[in-house]
């Protein structure tokens, strides 16, 4: 499909009641966009990193009762899975779109990565004020990257077994960067460029 951008309808899909109905909306309306966006960004990251990257689209197969509050694509160097590795995400809650560099609770090197970021503060200090962080990919709550929550979020990521750290940028449903498609791709590439130094540091 030709990607024309994300619309308010995509956010409304994440409000559809019921597991079956919401999953139908995600599969029919959002995942084709994820495939189109993800293929472009996977190619972009592969070239930028000099390493083959692979696209994964969340299937939410473990859900049997409650519909997913968010849905996403992930881009990772591992073809078999992304959750235990540093990876990039583009996804939606019902009230914002996110572009993250994500370290979720399955990551096996959380302490090492958190300590590196805590020690090398310049890596995160150079991020734009428009960027945000999240301590939990399942929750909508985010914080501006420079508002004082960064250190405690990294410490929680290091010290708590299911701690997480996500950093990137969020967009409200009426943000002009979400469409047309070429504008969103350009914006996403800009965000990824800012996150690549962190990604490389996490892999060291």
UniProtKB/Swiss-Prot annotation:
InterPro entries membership: UPF0637 (IPR009403), UPF0637_domain_sf (IPR053707)
Residues forming coiled coils: none
Superkingdom of the source species: Bacteria
Similarity comment: Belongs to the UPF0637 family.
UniProt name for this protein: UPF0637 protein lwe1043
């Amino acid at each position: 499909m030709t990607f024309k951008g994300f619309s308010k309808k995509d956010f409304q899909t994440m409000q559809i009641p019921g597991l079956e109905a919401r999953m139908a909306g995600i599969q029919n309306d959002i995942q084709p966009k994820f495939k189109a966006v993800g293929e472009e960004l996977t190619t972009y990251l592969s070239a930028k990193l000099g390493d083959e990257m692979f696209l994964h689209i969340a299937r939410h197969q473990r859900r049997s009762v409650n519909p997913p509050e968010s849905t996403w694509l992930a881009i990772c160097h591992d073809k078999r899975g992304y959750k235990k590795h540093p990876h990039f995400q583009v996804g939606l809650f019902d009230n914002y779109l996110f572009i993250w560099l994500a370290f979720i609770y399955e990551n096996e090197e959380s302490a090492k990565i958190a300590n590196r970021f805590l020690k090398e503060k310049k890596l995160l200090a150079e991020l734009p004020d428009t960027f945000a962080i999240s301590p939990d990919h399942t929750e909508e709550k985010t914080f501006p990257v420079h508002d004082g929550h960064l250190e405690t979020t990294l410490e929680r990521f290091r010290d708590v077994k299911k701690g997480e750290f996500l950093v990137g940028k969020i967009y409200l449903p009426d943000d002009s960067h979400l469409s047309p498609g070429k504008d969103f791709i350009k914006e996403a590439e800009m965000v990824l460029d800012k996150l690549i130094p962190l990604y490389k540091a996490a892999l060291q």
